[in-house]
Amino acid sequence: EHLTSITAMCKDNNDNIYILDANSRIVVLDSNYNFVKEIGLINGSIDYNNAKGIYFNDGKIYVCNTEGANIYIINTSGELLDTITVPESTLIPTDFNFRPTKITIDPSGYIYVVSDGCFYGALLYSPDRTFLGFYGANTVNVTVASVLTNISNRLFPNVEKHANSMKKVPYSFVDI
């Protein structure tokens, strides 16, 4: 079956390529692009349809199950080893929508996760998967002049001023 919706790729230490297809499968190719195997539904029941990120580290495959709001950690046979879900922390806002799209792991084992629409930065986990906080959090620069201009625009609105009154928010992360 052909790949129809490739959403992400990564490779292991042997240069095997892992292709995440949005149709709940991972296709593995060797370094010469020859088919090795396909990893389908995890344990026959856990679906990663529309997953958007994949990463290989230390014999484990990390699959960002965006719609399912978690990250599956599987072995190369497709067996579920663990799951990362939204962390329970006072640093996480109550309205936070955990939608992991990208993941990477540094040489020390720290895990960085990008969540779709998150303005706080990448979620940072320790090597034992304890949530540490946000990495690379954005700031919005606000000056006294911009606040006064915003107040003026609200008090004396017109079309041009209304266009300038859009709420200033930091950009959301899309990749790591």
Where are these regions (language model features)?
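Eukaryotic scaffold repeat domains enriched in small/polar residues
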Residues: 1-176
